[in-house]
Amino acid sequence: MEFSAKQIAEYIQGIIVGDENATVHTFAKIEEGVPGAISFLSNPKYTHYIYDTQSTIVLVNKDFVPEQEVKATLIKVDNAYESLAKLLTLYEMSKPKKTGIDPLAYVAPTAKLGKDVYIAPFACVGDGAEIGDNTSLHPHATVGSHAKVGNNCTLYPHATIYHDCLVGNHCTLHAGCVIGADGFGFAPSPEGYEKIPQIGIAIIEDNVEIGANTCVDRATMGATIVHKGVKLDNLIQIAHNVEVGSHTVMASQVGIAGSTKVGEWCMFGGQVGLAGHIKIGDKVGIGAQAGVPGNVKSNEQILGTPAIDAKNFMKSSAVYKKLPEIYTTLNAMQKEIEELKKQLNK
């Protein structure tokens, strides 16, 4: 498909600087631009590429002022990255979508399927399970008995939803992610550890995206809940009875222990670890590899292990870098003091 700068600008409410009739048919990074491609510039580190890019159209923020001639047609918008997302979404929606049940898929006789669903080869839908309209199950995706998946969802290969668990509308579950596996519950006894049956469920609300090989365990009792708009990267562990607030985002390898409650609009860097049975407030930012042993109030920014206020951590880090120099200075001072003591005692 081909679109003109004028059509694109109207769709994203942008202002054209250049040829409104310039046309594009593909996307490209600004540093890899080719004729007929549309690119974007939002990070100042990439500004120098705009003067040499071969892309036909470039999305830029409204405050961008070129320092030299730009050959590409510019479309100025409030947020270039956000506008790119809208265009990419439109592009994805324009792709043909498969529907129907492949002969090699298994759908239980008691399962309920919505309109225009796609069940790929070797996908499985269990007894009493429900699949909403326009939802796609890719090869080997599994929806367990009496589980429910909403409308406009995509389950990529080997995504698994265990029995009785609930997934809302407009959700994306990437390859290998698991919703509703047993929580890590074992009771110690003289003979070892006895398994505690996990009789709860996991609930994934609307507009959630879950990365590859991420696990959201079912609750011991009640529900593990991932609220609306949450975005989880690959390789994340959400333990039993955890609750993740709306629109929170987490980078890869985050681990959250059981029964911890995370607020709304939080941002966690990679490899953050949260202890169990704690509460994290709203709009909390936690830097990569931080270990959080206790409650965190709303709007705090923390770093380190154990995690502390981010500004204090940075100050401590600056001192830490100087420890060898400080040690040398202290050692020299100690020797001077010992010499002074000897002289005073003569």
Curated annotation (Swiss-Prot):
SUPFAM superfamilies: Trimeric LpxA-like enzymes
GO biological process, one term: lipid A biosynthetic process
Domain of life: Bacteria
CDD domains reported in the protein's UniProt record: LbH_LpxD
Keywords from the named record: Acyltransferase, Lipid A biosynthesis, Lipid biosynthesis, Lipid metabolism, Repeat, Transferase
GO function terms (MF aspect): N-acyltransferase activity
UniProt GO cellular component terms: membrane
Keyword hit for Lipid metabolism: yes
EC number(s) given by UniProt: 2.3.1.191
Enzyme active site: H240
Metabolic or biological pathway: Bacterial outer membrane biogenesis; LPS lipid A biosynthesis
InterPro entries: Hexapep, LpxD, Trimer_LpxA-like_sf, UDP_GlcNAc_AcTrfase_non-rep
The protein's enzyme class: transferase
Catalytic activity: a UDP-3-O-[(3R)-3-hydroxyacyl]-alpha-D-glucosamine + a (3R)-hydroxyacyl-[ACP] = a UDP-2-N,3-O-bis[(3R)-3-hydroxyacyl]-alpha-D-glucosamine + holo-[ACP] + H(+)
Keyword Repeat: yes
UniProt family annotation: Belongs to the transferase hexapeptide repeat family. LpxD subfamily.
Function of the molecule: Catalyzes the N-acylation of UDP-3-O-acylglucosamine using 3-hydroxyacyl-ACP as the acyl donor. Is involved in the biosynthesis of lipid A, a phosphorylated glycolipid that anchors the lipopolysaccharide to the outer membrane of the cell.
Subunit structure: Homotrimer.
Protein name as it appears in the record: UDP-3-O-acylglucosamine N-acyltransferase
Organism: Phocaeicola vulgatus (strain ATCC 8482 / DSM 1447 / JCM 5826 / CCUG 4940 / NBRC 14291 / NCTC 11154)
Lineage, uppermost ranks: Bacteria, Pseudomonadati, Bacteroidota, Bacteroidia, Bacteroidales
